[in-house]
């Protein structure tokens, strides 16, 4: 189980993203069993995003990863493959995809009242 929340900052119309294809690509890239990678894509209007200085171009994409941390030494490798797959799916440069790993999800994610045991 990683859960990946992808937030795409957009200027106008929300970008069309094939979320299913992205989930499959991320699952393959992360060597995950089918059904264990979950992806949610949301859009954030550029008017609701700012950086100090000029507005960046192209606009950024943020990916929050909720997963069991396991070996945090693998995070750079995972960040690379996540950024590459997301960049392809949303048609943005990989450098504009920011991957953020949340704290270890062990004991924090439940299905109903049962903790995730995968």
Q: What spans do the regions from the language model cover?
A:
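Interaction-mediating elements
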Residues: 1-118
């Amino acid at each position: 189980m990683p859960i990946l929340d992808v937030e795409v900052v957009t200027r106008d119309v929300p970008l069309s993203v094939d979320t299913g294809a992205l989930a499959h690509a991320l699952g393959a890239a992360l060597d995950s069993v089918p059904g264990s990678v979950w992806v949610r894509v949301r859009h954030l209007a550029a008017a609701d995003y700012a950086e100090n200085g000029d507005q960046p171009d192209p606009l950024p994409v943020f990916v929050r990863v909720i997963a069991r941390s396991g070996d945090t030494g693998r995070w750079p490798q995972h960040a690379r493959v996540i950024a590459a797959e997301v960049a392809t799916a949303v048609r943005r440069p990989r450098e504009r995809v920011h991957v953020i790993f949340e704290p270890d999800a062990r004991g924090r994610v439940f299905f109903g009242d049962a903790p995730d045991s995968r």
